[in-house]
């Protein structure tokens, strides 16, 4: 900066990505901000996120089902359908990011770090997590019923040449409920590691295109790997029940949704949030100290930036 210039260069904003310490601070602030919303606002944001998951799971199911045509399936199996399904589904997370919607699985990381840093109380933590989970369920299942089911897009056909979309969803649902409890928990852990990393990428990468690509491939990885995501499964398995696929309520809710919920929570709150808190907890303390003085220029700049971002939410 030249002497006497009224313009200053923000050492944070000129970078396209944050440091590891800055990313953690952003994660805590992001989680802390969620506790400030009233219940109805949290619920509306969570329902919207559930709808977005339903919208893109519907599109993914249709796209994958078209490649599940019985003659094609004889040669390539489910591989082509899985590729197309995984390539379509990440759009849901980009919609959630763009609209500021609230997804339970991402909250397992962000809000947990805020809890560990004592920026939210246990009661606030439980309120945010329970409302986000309930709202996601309402949004995903409502879309499954009012759009996917009532439209007849996944209905069963007697003619095998027209039954590939139903068969694709049926086979996915059967596979999901066939896991043992422990297997499902493990697959859910793998899933939410990717989802929470996608959230972390959003908080770390400032370049728009870089952020989109990072989120896209993180979500694509879990979708094509056959991992278990609680909100996506709420849509898929409840739709399978509605169209009378070869699953029942016990298999859906006890054999899949319960262990998936446990595994997703373990991944975000224990596998990721706890180590990050242990590594960077002092960085957040330093960040808080710089709010009142100019001790560390980088953290001071981040403090100003985070406060400006918070005031805009």
Curated annotation (Swiss-Prot):
As for membrane topology, the entry says:
Multi-pass membrane protein
Where do Polar residues bias regions lie? 298-313
**Residue ranges of the region described as Disordered:** 290-313
List the molecular function annotations (GO) for this entry. Answer: high-affinity secondary active nitrite transmembrane transporter activity
Q: Which UniProt keywords apply?
A: Cell membrane, Membrane, Transmembrane, Transmembrane helix, Transport, Vacuole
UniProt topological domain (Cytoplasmic) ranges: 1-46, 99-127, 206-210, 278-313
| Subcellular localization | Cell membrane; Vacuole membrane
Q: Which GO terms describe its cellular component?
A: plasma membrane; vacuolar membrane
Its primary localisation, in coarse terms, equals: membrane
TM ranges: 47-67, 78-98, 128-148, 185-205, 211-231, 257-277
Q: Name one GO biological process term.
A: nitrite transport
Name the reaction it catalyses.
Answer: (S)-lactate(in) + H(+)(in) = (S)-lactate(out) + H(+)(out); formate(in) + H(+)(in) = formate(out) + H(+)(out); pyruvate(out) + H(+)(out) = pyruvate(in) + H(+)(in); acetate(out) + H(+)(out) = acetate(in) + H(+)(in)
Q: How is its activity regulated?
A: Inhibited by the Malaria Box compound MMV007839 and its derivatives BH296 and BH267.meta.
In terms of Gene3D superfamilies, this protein maps to: Glycerol uptake facilitator protein
**Oligomer status and interactors:** Homopentamer.
The task this protein performs is described as: Monocarboxylate-proton symporter that mediates the efflux of the waste product lactate in the intraerythrocytic parasites; active in acidic-to-neutral pH range. Transports L-lactate.
State the family it belongs to.
Belongs to the FNT transporter (TC 1.A.16) family.
Protein's recorded name: Formate-nitrite transporter
State the organism named in the record.
Answer: Plasmodium vivax
